[in-house]
Amino acid sequence: MRNFDLSPLMRQWIGFDKLANALQNAGESQSFPPYNIEKSDDNHYRITLALAGFRQEDLEILLEGTRLSVKGTPEQPKEEKKWLHQGLMNQPFSLSFTLAENMEVSGATFVNGLLHIDLIRNEPEPIAAQRIAISERPALNS
């Protein structure tokens, strides 16, 4: 697997390094699970994954630095089924997203087969200039 970190070049994007994720997954045609990235306002985002057939116990979310990883390991049926048509995927998966420096995960919920991961951008306060008084006597005695 190839890893490219282009996040320093793309800080103006919405908090996600889409190009780096695309390059990292080049050659791996990962289309499961489908997901959306929603922007509520300049500081609030939501990642939603469609996970029909998964249980909350099957899912794991990890945040390591700026890398958000979501893994799913569904419980396998005890007996093999004979499918006439199988359109719903129920397979293990691993997805990762690169977050911008000031992004934080504010919470996650799993409702009706949809995993929602809420993100907040916390912009640091700018450091105010500090005025230094100038005295007439020397600061160091020599």
Curated annotation (Swiss-Prot):
Residues 26-137 form the sHSP domain. InterPro entries: A-crystallin/Hsp20_dom (IPR002068), ACD_IbpA/B (IPR037913), HSP20-like_chaperone (IPR008978), HSP20_IbpB (IPR022848). Gene3D superfamilies: 2.60.40.790. GO terms for biological process: protein stabilization. Pfam families: HSP20. It is found in: Cytoplasm. Keywords: Chaperone, Cytoplasm, Stress response. It comes from the Bacteria. Its main location: cytoplasm. GO terms for cellular component: cytoplasm. Belongs to the small heat shock protein (HSP20) family. Homodimer. Forms homomultimers of about 100-150 subunits at optimal growth temperatures. Conformation changes to oligomers at high temperatures or high ionic concentrations. The decrease in size of the multimers is accompanied by an increase in chaperone activity. Associates with aggregated proteins, together with IbpA, to stabilize and protect them from irreversible denaturation and extensive proteolysis during heat shock and oxidative stress. Aggregated proteins bound to the IbpAB complex are more efficiently refolded and reactivated by the ATP-dependent chaperone systems ClpB and DnaK/DnaJ/GrpE. Its activity is ATP-independent. The N- and C-terminal flexible termini are involved in oligomerization and in the binding of non-native substrate proteins, and are essential for chaperone activity. This is Small heat shock protein IbpB.
